[in-house]
């Protein structure tokens, strides 16, 4: 997998922020973390992926998020890129339990075939001390490649108020995979 200069820059910034925040040892965050920047690495059936993502809450409880993903694909012997944007709303359900719904649009490069996509996603997040457990379902419709149902779950561990690391699992009709993530929350 080829790592691009923007990926290295964002990764370096996240590591620097994580080191600064770890030294501060602040109290864990207890509110939802929709303001974030993260980098993740995933091992999927069809290859490996590096993702740079971020989100901003712009008018509570609404948020926008986006990602750039590069996938080194074994299935098509090529690299694939994906760019996507989400617009969502979250709902406080109970102490530490939050639901969110999101509309998604984007574009993915399937090697020789490019396709736009649209879809929806719904997630539940439960905060317990420094752990945040999540699970969700999603649907994507690719204009040139059919549709996909997505199921995911995982856990994030907050090292301090602004830094978390996590592991997640995602299953879809195009394959499944495990994702490792480091996030900075602001």
PLM segments and residue spans:
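Cleavable N-terminal export/targeting peptides
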Residues: 1-33
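Solvent-exposed loop/turn segments connecting transmembrane beta-strands
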Residues: 40-50, 71-81, 95, 107-118, ...
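Outer-membrane beta-barrel "beta-signal"
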Residues: 85, 153-157, 175-186
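Residue-level signature of outer-membrane beta-barrel architecture
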Residues: 56-58, 89-91, 105, 124-126, ...
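Surface-exposed, polar helix/loop patches in the mature regions of secreted/periplasmic/lumenal proteins
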Residues: 100-134
């Amino acid at each position: 997998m080829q790592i691009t200069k923007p990926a290295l820059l964002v990764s370096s910034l996240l590591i620097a922020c994580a080191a600064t925040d770890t030294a501060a040892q602040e109290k864990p965050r207890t509110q939802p973390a929709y303001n974030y920047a993260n980098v993740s690495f995933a091992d999927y059936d069809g290859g490996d992926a590096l993702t740079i993502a971020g989100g901003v809450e712009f008018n509570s409880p609404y948020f926008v998020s986006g990602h750039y993903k590069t996938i080194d694909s074994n299935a098509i012997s090529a690299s694939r890129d994906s760019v996507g944007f989400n617009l969502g709303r979250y709902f406080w359900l109970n102490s530490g339990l939050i639901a969110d719904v999101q509309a998604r649009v984007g574009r993915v490069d399937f090697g020789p075939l490019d396709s736009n996509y649209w879809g929806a996603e719904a997630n539940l997040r439960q905060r317990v001390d420094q752990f945040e457990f999540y699970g969700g379902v999603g649907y994507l419709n690719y204009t040139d490649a059919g549709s996909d149902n997505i199921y995911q779950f995982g856990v994030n561990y907050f090292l301090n108020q602004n830094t978390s690391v996590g592991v997640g699992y995602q299953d879809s009709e195009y394959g499944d995979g495990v994702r490792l993530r480091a996030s900075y929350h602001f």
